[in-house]
Amino acid sequence: MRRLHRNLSLLFLICILNEYRIESQTLSPPITDRFKCLTNGCCDHHEWCRFWASIGECNANKDWMTENCQLACGTCTAPAAPLLPVTTTASSFNGGGFVQTTTQSSGPTTTITIPPSSLTSVTSCERVKDSIAQASELMSISRLINPVEDNFGRNMLSIDDITRSVPTGCVPQLSDVGVDCRKSLCYHLMYRTLDGTCNNLEKPMQGAAFRRFNRHFPAQYDDGKGEPISSLNQSRPSAREANRVMLSSAQSVVHDKFNNMMMQWGQFMSHDMSKTTLQPSANCKTCDPVPSKCMPIPIGEKDPNLGFKSKQCLKVSRSAPICRVEPREQLNENTAYIDGSMIYGSSLKDLHKFRDGRTGFLRVTRFNNQNVLPFDQSKCANKDKCTASFTAGDIRANLFIGLSSLHIMFAREHNRIAQKLTELNPTWSGDRVFQEARKIVGAQIQNVLYKEYLPKLLGVSFDKVIGPYKGYDTNVDATIANEFTTSAFRFGHGMIEEFYKRVDLSGNNITHGGFFFGDGVFKSGKILFEGGVDPIIRGFMTTAVKRPHRMTPAITEKMFGSTDLGSLNIQRGRDHGIPSYNKMRQFCGLKSANTFDDFADMILDRNLRAGLARNYNTTNDVDFYVGSMLEDPVIGGLVGTTLSCAIGEQFKRARDGDRFYFENPGIFTRSQMEEIKKSSLSRIICDNADNFELVSQDAFLLPGSNLTPCSKIPKMDLSKWRAL
């Protein structure tokens, strides 16, 4: 019976192999001897070992499988042995067919002396898991590193899957079916998955992409199920009126120390952590609400914007709800972790769009003597007729050329690191190079975020709301809070300026000049034909950042010619059922305000409190976005107490609940961790700009007269990644 079971399994797999073809070529015959071997001599002797293991053959045919499928069944007990020169074949099922790549290993050609170490090699990744704080060293000396994840039998989603689902009225969540972190333990101990699964080995779906946001409070809907706040019961002013009266202002107050990179890095980070699925805006053609799909913002008689008045409303599509979930919840398409999702995407099914085949590099395009993100050159014949969009891990890379510039910088940084790793380790596979470079880039982003950006944003609140790192906590869930992504971290829209300058090497305006904000939206041609990313980055670093407490007319009156970003933020909060400002004050340990003057502890300006009283019925009606933006900033920071609380709480969980946070022992070797601590945004700019010679040591500070040569900015020593 067992032999029959195995034969039926074999027949089933042969049927699959016959059905799926790649580029009109059938797959090569299975390898049946030493298909995959570790350096300790343990092998899977058949190409289908993992398939048989996935359907229970390790138990059903224990004797045969124990001997012949040692890796798939986890039955290897062999002692350490020399590296075997074997042919390895990696196969995976990606939903559209089997993808197979074969590489030939010629074995070691030189004798390498391993330096003395207190660690001794182990024979399995389960043993490494028992010494997790030394995982990186153990995996290396035991030669257990596997840069390819086994996804066979696991459900995966892609951006295309979500896009195809939206017209049905709802979107699916990523299922936990087939998610077994033990199956690819040697991969999971060293590298992140693209979709964030198995970061927490015991709770593998925490922080994963294509899952619902968390909440600090239950969703606040008019009907308790999904109707937006103030849609059935007119309890609040329209989002447009609230923004126009309370937040929109042509007055710009700038910071005396921080530069515009604070604004741009914040947007870059927000796209790393979350992306909400929206209903198609084409569904919203009138000023009448469409159930579950459209929630237009009416324009009042007193509104001075004649363009808005002529259209009578601002058309707003709702976020797509998750299927079969009530009350209504929204989907996060990105992972919750600081992992470079905006660079690499959040699904293995999408990676081919960004990665250069099976090499260690990201795809780039050489255009006008600069390496940029891939784009369709047929749509960019000249600067006056350029409608091309860059391809990146997050489609929003094209929203603003400042954001595009950071995307380009980090794609170049990945490839710079990948090139160096290839030179240091010529025997590494493309998969190994790619995963190591991706891991390093993610760690650099974390270092810049927690050591450079957040202390400036949060000022004296940083130590209280985030504090020093005390290690990975398996009980901390990094999943993004709806209150954070929908309201709190949209504070950065208040930092957007009317005009941005572009600066040359000498500190002068470039020939093409600066640009108004609206002229930098979806304008890739300005990068491709007007000097590249350098002048944009220099302009950001030499211009004081606008304090975020008011919103410039560039985004409240002129955004894309027909909408108001501030009103959109308020409306999105109501769409998602975000609790009121008063409720979030309580979450942050402040007293509940019974009168509008009770807000005086955080909103010192009595005129602002009076404005709230004129526009809102009660203190419990004030939108979180509006109230928090009006708060006076904390000492040394850019945001007020409630925002610093909501933002800090999320970033603390994103750090402490991330097994791959770079300071967590075992993720990198000790020497590698010390190198990552040397990284900085200034160094990344110096290494990847087309022509940068002088830079502020801290990329977020105005340079004054203290510019530093790039040669004196500390840099990582990538030789610490040379394999033994």
Curated annotation (Swiss-Prot):
Disruption phenotype: Gross morphological abnormalities causing larval arrest with associated molt defects and low levels of embryonic lethality. Cuticle function and integrity are also impaired. It catalyses: 2 a phenolic donor + H2O2 = 2 a phenolic radical donor + 2 H2O. Ca(2+) binds at D272, T335, Y337, D339, S341. Gene3D superfamilies: Haem peroxidase domain superfamily, animal type (1.10.640.10). It comes from the Eukaryota. Its EC number is 1.11.1.7. Belongs to the peroxidase family. This is Peroxidase mlt-7. It comes from Caenorhabditis elegans.
